[in-house]
Amino acid sequence: MTKTAKVSDIVRDWVVLDAKDKVFGRLITEIAVLLRGKHRPFYTPNVDCGDFVVVINANKVKFSGMKLEDKEYFTHSGYFGSTKSKTLQEMLEKTPEKLYHLAVRGMLPKTKLGKAMIKKLKVYRDDKHPHTAQTSKKDAK
């Protein structure tokens, strides 16, 4: 008989991932799997059974090809002529946290459950983070 997970039965872990010298896309897919809980044997799609993920050294990640110069992110406020664009290099220097959230958000469900999952992602530029008390089990994969 298939057992479905209940919210009361889930014990969340804190996973620290070091982004230094890792390929961005592969790291993002690993983060999305951990946030959704698909690595657990009792994964249930309609229950948030994922872990908390802390990413350190966020701006030291690698990109393949010419993505740093070629890839652009667009924003639009709704007013005429207000389209602005930033390259991947600019996003990585100014707001790497936003870059990770945008990439992971695209891999999560576009529902209330997805919003709850993305709140469990913590991204930091360097190797210092305020979650050292929670991260006792798994450190720096």
Curated annotation (Swiss-Prot):
One GO BP annotation of this record: translation
Keywords of the record: Ribonucleoprotein, Ribosomal protein
PROSITE patterns xref list: RIBOSOMAL_L13 (PS00783)
Cystine pairings recorded for this chain: none
Matches recorded under InterPro entries: Ribosomal_uL13 (IPR005822), Ribosomal_uL13_bac-type (IPR005823), Ribosomal_uL13_CS (IPR023563), Ribosomal_uL13_sf (IPR036899)
Keyword Cell division (UniProt): no
Pfam family, one: Ribosomal_L13
Domain of life of the organism encoding this protein: Bacteria
A molecular function (GO) term: mRNA binding
SUPFAM superfamilies named in the record: Ribosomal protein L13
Cellular component aspect of the GO annotation: cytosolic large ribosomal subunit
CDD domains documented for this protein: Ribosomal_L13
Function of the protein: This protein is one of the early assembly proteins of the 50S ribosomal subunit, although it is not seen to bind rRNA by itself. It is important during the early stages of 50S assembly.
Subunit structure: Part of the 50S ribosomal subunit.
Sequence similarity: Belongs to the universal ribosomal protein uL13 family.
Protein name: Large ribosomal subunit protein uL13
Gene: rplM
